[in-house]
Swiss-Prot record:
GO terms for cellular component: box H/ACA snoRNP complex. The keyword Protein biosynthesis does not apply. It holds the Pfam family Nop10p. The keyword Ribonucleoprotein applies. GO terms for molecular function: snoRNA binding; telomerase RNA binding. This is H/ACA ribonucleoprotein complex subunit 3-like protein. Required for ribosome biogenesis. Part of a complex which catalyzes pseudouridylation of rRNA. This involves the isomerization of uridine such that the ribose is subsequently attached to C5, instead of the normal N1. Pseudouridine ('psi') residues may serve to stabilize the conformation of rRNAs. Component of the small nucleolar ribonucleoprotein particles containing H/ACA-type snoRNAs (H/ACA snoRNPs). Residues 18-40 are annotated as: Disordered. It comes from Trypanosoma cruzi. Keywords: Nucleus, Ribonucleoprotein, Ribosome biogenesis, rRNA processing. The lineage of its organism: Eukaryota, Discoba, Euglenozoa, Kinetoplastea, Metakinetoplastina.
Length: 63
């Protein structure tokens, strides 16, 4: 059995079931595996930089 999660009113609800009470499939509550041999990290960083989605490039909010 794996821990599953579904969203209710913007909050996470954890369960062991594969379906939520509404009949929708639940999602895995575990993060994806980390691989030091990540072949696509360069491409992800390029795309995030292009669309200014990197956390280090967030602009401060104006006062």
């Amino acid at each position: 059995m794996h821990l599953q999660v579904y969203i209710v009113n913007g909050k996470r609800q954890y369960t062991l079931k594969k379906m939520d009470p509404e009949g929708k499939p639940t999602l895995s509550a575990h993060p994806a595996r980390f691989s030091p041999d990540d072949k696509y990290s360069r491409h992800r960083i390029t795309i995030k930089r292009r669309f200014k989605a990197l956390k280090s490039e967030k602009r401060p909010k104006p006062l």
